[in-house]
UniProtKB/Swiss-Prot annotation:
GO terms for cellular component: cytosol. It holds the Pfam family ALS_ss_C. It comes from Haemophilus influenzae (strain ATCC 51907 / DSM 11121 / KW20 / Rd). GO terms for biological process: isoleucine biosynthetic process; L-valine biosynthetic process. Pathway: Amino-acid biosynthesis; L-isoleucine biosynthesis; L-isoleucine from 2-oxobutanoate: step 1/4; Amino-acid biosynthesis; L-valine biosynthesis; L-valine from pyruvate: step 1/4. Keywords: Amino-acid biosynthesis, Branched-chain amino acid biosynthesis, Transferase. It is an enzyme of class 2 (transferase). This is Acetolactate synthase small subunit. InterPro entries: Acetalactate_synth_ssu, Acetolactate_synth/TF_NikR_C, Acetolactate_synth_ssu_C, ACT-like_dom_sf, ACT_dom, AHAS_ACT, AHAS_small-like_ACT. Belongs to the acetolactate synthase small subunit family. Dimer of large and small chains. GO terms for molecular function: acetolactate synthase activity; acetolactate synthase regulator activity. Residues 4-79 form the ACT domain. Its EC number is 2.2.1.6.
């Protein structure tokens, strides 16, 4: 089972470590983790994507609520939400493949953000599935030199918010 948790926690050293520690104590792998300060500089928002046994993930979620540094935990998987990820893909771009790579970037609504005589760096944002499909399409067309993915960010749809 896949679960996306949005966690509001104190923006101080050690808070991230305690949250991640709950997952590692139970031998759970975090698929994706993003953290950044909110508009309130004393708080950070963390988005955690984890895959595993539903009961174990539920237990971890309950334990998160008990951590002193954590103000709020929302399971976005159980409600309408929007999720995005950013990828930077550096690819070999020589000869006739340059035009095809540009076409792929356009089809997926990516932007070429760096150009050299032998490579392009393309930025793309979208769902995990869109990012995966883009990377697969690039692999069929050219050589991937480097890939960097941001990790998942997510927010509930509509009027709801975590604050």
């Amino acid at each position: 089972m896949r679960r996306i948790l949005s966690v509001l926690l104190e923006n101080e050293s050690g808070a991230l470590s305690r949250v991640v520690g709950l997952f590692s104590q139970r031998a759970f792998n975090i698929e994706s983790l993003t953290v950044a300060p909110t508009d309130d500089p004393t708080l950070s928002r963390m988005t955690i994507e984890a895959v595993g046994d539903a009961q174990a993930l539920e237990q971890i979620e309950k334990q998160l609520h008990k951590l002193v540094d954590v103000f709020k935990v929302v399971n976005l998987s159980e409600q309408e939400h929007i999720e995005r990820e950013i990828v930077l893909a550096k690819v070999r771009a020589v000869g006739s493949s340059r035009d095809e790579i540009k076409r792929l970037a356009d089809i997926f609504r990516g932007q070429i953000v760096d150009v050299t005589p032998k490579s392009y760096t393309i930025q793309l944002s979208g769902t995990n599935d869109k990012v995966d499909a883009f990377i697969s399409a690039l692999k069929e067309e050219t050589t991937l030199l480097e890939i960097v993915r941001s990790g998942l960010i997510s927010v509930s749809r509509g009027e709801k918010n975590i604050l």
